[in-house]
Structure formats: C-alpha cells, structure tokens
Amino acid sequence: MMWFDKQDDRCLFADCREGVMEINHLPAAQGRSAKKVQPDEIHDFRDMPYQNESFHHVVYDPPHVRNISMKSVTGFSYGSLDKETWQDDLRLGFAECFRVLKPHGTLIFKWNEVDIPLREVLTLTPEKPLYGHRSGKKANTHWVAFVKHGG
C-alpha cells in the first residue's frame, strides 16, 4: 500500500477485492504472514459511485498483469486484468478517474511494465500526462501525473 497513514481522513482506498490470504509456504526464517486487501469502500474502478468532480486528487493504480491467478500471492495482492478486455477496462478506468476529478485536480497513475508497456496504456486516454517518474529495481514502475483541464 502506498499510503503513509491509512487512517488519514483525506485518504479513501477503494477496490473491488477484499480479504486476507495466509502465506504458509514461506520458510520459518522469513516468518509466516498474511496479505490483506482491506479497502474503505468496495467498488469497480470502471464504474465509481461518486458524483462528477468529487475529488481534488485521485490515484489510479489498476492491476498491471493479464490473467494471473487470483489464488497466487501476486494475483491476490494486485488483481488481474482480463486478457480480452484489459484495454477497454483501463480506458473506462481513466474516464472514471477524470470524471470524478475536479477541474485542475491531479491524477497520479501508477503502472508497472512487467506485462504491458506504458506507451500502450497511455493511448487509452485522450488526456496527456504532465510529467512522470520511473522507480523500482528495474525502473519499470512508472508514476505519471496528469492535471485535469479547468472547467
């Protein structure tokens, strides 16, 4: 999770998944643990239940991989894109993010190129990013900033 303080009332974590996965296959030296997905609200990023122009700031961090098993730790933790509909799904997600964003609001889009290059994903929105940053061990995680045009 990217939040410094999940309890901060300025943060709203929404996801279509919720649950806990026990991780028992780790060696005892690494400690056994659990992965948790505990959103504040449960809904689909393609159809958010918020009114237009509700937020000053939105972070869009969709699944980055197509067809990974939801029974795997990675699939449980990050979700999976459908191999047939991923482009439409991400396109709808971008549209929803900009719909709920106030004029001059910021959208931070997080993407990992493990499966799909960022350049392909950015074609799914007519909006143009303002700037971005690469991070991660292989520099394949991108943080991309958009600013919504004024109303």
Report the location of each language-model feature:
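Class I S-adenosyl-L-methionine-dependent methyltransferase catalytic core
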Residues: 1-151
